[in-house]
Amino acid sequence: MNEICDTAVCMPDVQSSADTRQIAIDKVGIKSIRHPVRVADKADGVQHTIANFNMYVFLPHNFKGTHMSRFIEILNTREREISVENFEGMLRQMVERLEAESGYIEMTFPYFINKSAPVSGVQSMLDYEVTFVGAIENGQYTHTTKVVVPVTSLCPCSKKISEYGAHNQRSHVTVTAKTRGFLWIEDLVRKVEDQASCELFGLLKRPDEKYVTERAYDNPKFVEDIVRDVAAAMNAEPLIDAYVVEAENFESIHNHSAYALIEHDKRKK
């Protein structure tokens, strides 16, 4: 036996040893590792971006630890081929490789949409934070898409009581949707932006700035209005089985935010 083999034999595998505390671990793995990915782009076919991965598996009570290096190996063997289409396959590979009952992968990445200004038509990119969450439990795969959409909100009360003007601010609407099939990121973003006082743009000329200012003023909404209107849009989408809608207004006249949340599972009557 050569020296390398002798060394390997002599090195104890501590993580594979038994644990006597009789306590299982729901999720164990790695967090915050970045890797290049490909994402389906409705306009251009594919978009290359960098994702931040969290990867976990279930660990039975009788095992001391999991094989942390195997998570990295799964990412590295796929090089640049990670995409939405093979997301489930990668998750199943992870569960099989680590001999786990259940597994979870969270993939968070910036996604860019090319938008045209409302009057001038000048184009610019706007970024959105997107997270894909895949889970395998009892052999069943589920997929969840989470999108953070920045929008403008304008206060109806401020408009009503003021002789001119109204306070407005940037807001974040977060939709976490459990889907039964493929849903374009762009379509989910559009469903949110349509319910805001006004959507955001990366670049605006003066005629565009006038338009978005007046658009928001003519379409005032409380944080409660936004979550209800977005929830109604989620209810109307047949590809969405369940969702959580959150809205946070970064109040321009306060040092705190306004917040609202609606959670609904359409499969439950």
Curated annotation (Swiss-Prot):
Gene name for this UniProt entry: folE2
GO BP: tetrahydrofolate biosynthetic process
Free-text function comment from the UniProt entry: Converts GTP to 7,8-dihydroneopterin triphosphate.
EC number, UniProt record: 3.5.4.16
Enzyme class: hydrolase
The protein, known as: GTP cyclohydrolase FolE2
InterPro entries membership: GTP_cyclohydrolase_FolE2, GTP_cyclohydrolase_FolE2/MptA
PANTHER family per the UniProt record, alphabetical: GTP CYCLOHYDROLASE MPTA
Coiled coil ranges: none
GO molecular function annotation: GTP cyclohydrolase I activity
The reaction(s) this protein catalyses: GTP + H2O = 7,8-dihydroneopterin 3'-triphosphate + formate + H(+)
Gene3D superfamilies in UniProt: Urate Oxidase
Pathway: Cofactor biosynthesis; 7,8-dihydroneopterin triphosphate biosynthesis; 7,8-dihydroneopterin triphosphate from GTP: step 1/1
